[in-house]
Swiss-Prot record:
Gene3D superfamilies: Small outer capsid protein Soc (3.90.930.20). Pfam families: Soc. Homotrimer. Interacts with the major capsid protein; three soc molecules associate with each interface between the major capsid protein facets. Coiled coil: none annotated. Keywords: Capsid decoration protein, Capsid protein, Virion. This is Small outer capsid protein. HAMAP family: SOC_T4.
Amino acid sequence: MGGYVNIKTFTHPAGEGKEVKGMEVSVPFEIYSNEHRIADAHYQTFPSEKAAYTTVVTDAADWRTKNAAMFTPTPVSG
């Protein structure tokens, strides 16, 4: 699949006397999807004000576990 993922971040505080500078970057979709393990995953994201699904992850450790599970192969039931 061609095209680009375009990401814009904004400068924001990062602790006492520090900040993360905003930046703009365009990444070829293939590189982005491979690095984020979404290649061939029929992956979709969309912003919303409220959670769209009943499973809601609220901390980073839980997200790492859930994210890994999203891409863990299991036997095909038939």
